[in-house]
Curated annotation (Swiss-Prot):
PROSITE patterns: PUA
Species, as recorded: Shewanella sp. (strain MR-7)
UniProt xrefs under SUPFAM superfamilies: PUA domain-like (SSF88697), S-adenosyl-L-methionine-dependent methyltransferases (SSF53335)
Protein name per UniProt: Ribosomal RNA large subunit methyltransferase I
Function: Specifically methylates the cytosine at position 1962 (m5C1962) of 23S rRNA.
UniProt-listed SMART domains: PUA
Keywords assigned by UniProt, alphabetized: Cytoplasm, Methyltransferase, RNA-binding, rRNA processing, S-adenosyl-L-methionine, Transferase
Protein's UniProt keywords contain DNA damage: no
CDD domains, per database record: AdoMet_MTases, PUA_RlmI, RlmI_M_like
Subcellular locations according to the entry: Cytoplasm
Source taxon at top rank: Bacteria
Catalytic reaction equation(s): cytidine(1962) in 23S rRNA + S-adenosyl-L-methionine = 5-methylcytidine(1962) in 23S rRNA + S-adenosyl-L-homocysteine + H(+)
A GO cellular component annotation in the UniProt record: cytoplasm
Enzyme Commission number(s) from the entry: 2.1.1.191
Length: 396
């Protein structure tokens, strides 16, 4: 029988709506002896059963719910069922877009809190970000090895958020033999080089797939400035769509080298592509001072806010960079701008860009609102899963 955790009066409402987190300040008491990662039953103050999850005593989120089904045990078969369901939910997308790289498990939104798994061709990359996920590591790897026998399994749990769970950063091979890096994945007929050992996150930003395709609609015969380009995939889509010129900007020389490789593996000539190792904030100001302009600008910056205390600063940062980008666009040009900060509400992000347009003395029209690709689902009871917000604006 699992240890029981009783909530304070009135703190059961979020779990009754199937939100999977129990915060430390909502717990009344713990009945039984617990080790970190142990499975616990959560009950309301009046004793009625709410859910079954993993105990994480050092985290502000002290329980992450595995299941809201009282009859469901947390064992190897549980993880196998969840992974099979997630794969089935992505099969149509894989066929439609010809994907060999996709998100297999999107943590809470796939019913596996703290677990992210991305598939890059014949490599599965895991991030285990919670105590419960860490404790079940061997079982998760065993299930993946059964379901994907031709895949190597590599861990990229080298993230600061593990510290909040009392866990050390870790990465390395968990199963099989890792192929030579980079691996090549495909999406929408485009090949992309991914280094799962050195790349950002698990190796690549799969969540922007649909937005890369969206951007390609606006670039034929146009000049494109691709800011925070990482491995240049917005620029890659633009090159294939017939952009007249492309400038890929990133502070990482390694990322720009991969951007060049991506052009080569797709058989594309990059004579009209400029690779600029530079600080985007400084470069945009320089271009404004020089009077340089573009037809299309992509702004895909890193996360500006990791916690609520940083949100005001993030708002100022987003407003500043969007204002300068708007000043660099030719009349009739297009801005594609993104925020990957989960704490940034979509409506607030749109207001920030609108305010930036006022300061830039430019008239804009919002023509698309963008989000993460559909292999990054948002659980109906887990709005925190909606983290990527994007806007397409026509600029006059």
């Amino acid at each position: 029988m699992a240890v029981r955790i009783k909530l304070k009066p009135g703190r059961e409402k979020s779990l009754e709506r199937r939100h999977p987190w129990v915060f430390s300040n909502g717990i009344h008491n713990v009945k039984g002896k617990l080790e970190p990662g142990d499975t616990v039953d959560v009950v309301a103050h009046d004793g009625h059963w709410l859910g079954r999850g993993a105990w994480s005593p050092e985290s502000q989120i002290q329980v992450r719910i595995w299941t809201f089904d009282r009859e469901e045990e947390i064992d190897r078969e549980f993880f196998k069922r969840r992974i099979l369901r997630a794969q089935a939910g992505r099969d149509d997308l894989i066929r439609e877009q010809g994907l060999t790289g996709y998100r297999l498990i999107a943590a809470e939104s796939d019913g596996l809190p703290g677990i992210t798994i991305d598939k890059y061709a014949n490599v599965l990359v895991c991030q285990l970000l919670s105590m419960g996920a860490d404790v079940w590591r061997d079982t998760i790897v065993d299930v993946l090895a059964e379901l994907y026998p031709d895949c190597a399994i590599y861990e990229r749990s080298d993230v600061d958020s593990r510290k909040k769970e009392g866990l050390a950063s870790t990465m390395g091979l968990l199963h099989g033999s890792l192929p030579e890096m980079p691996v090549i994945i495909e999406e929408n007929g485009i090949k992309i080089a991914v280094d799962v050992t050195k790349g950002h996150k698990t190796g690549f930003y799969l969540d922007q797939r649909d937005n890369r395709a969206m951007a390609a609609r606006f670039v034929k015969g146009k000049s494109v400035l691709n800011c925070f380009c990482y491995t240049g995939t917005f620029g890659l889509y633009a090159a294939k769509a017939g952009a007249a010129s492309i400038e890929n900007v990133d502070v990482s020389a390694l990322a720009l080298d991969t951007a060049r490789l991506n052009m080569r593996v797709n058989g594309l000539n990059d004579d009209n592509v400029h690779y600029n190792e530079a600080d985007v904030f400084k470069l945009l100001r320089q271009y404004r001072d020089e009077g340089k302009t573009f037809d299309v600008i992509v702004l895909d910056p890193p996360k500006f806010a990791d916690n609520k205390s940083q949100l005001n600063g993030a708002c100022r940062g987003y407003k500043d960079i969007n204002m300068i980008a708007l000043q660099l666009l030719n009349p009739g040009g297009v801005l594609l701008t993104f925020s990957c900060s989960g704490l940034m509400p979509a409506d607030l992000f749109q207001k920030i860009v609108a305010d930036a347009a006022l300061d830039a003395k430019r008239e804009i029209q919002f023509i698309e609102r963008l989000s993460q690709a559909s292999d990054h689902p948002i659980g109906s009871a887990f709005p925190e899963g909606f983290y990527l917000k994007g806007l397409v604006a026509r600029v006059w």
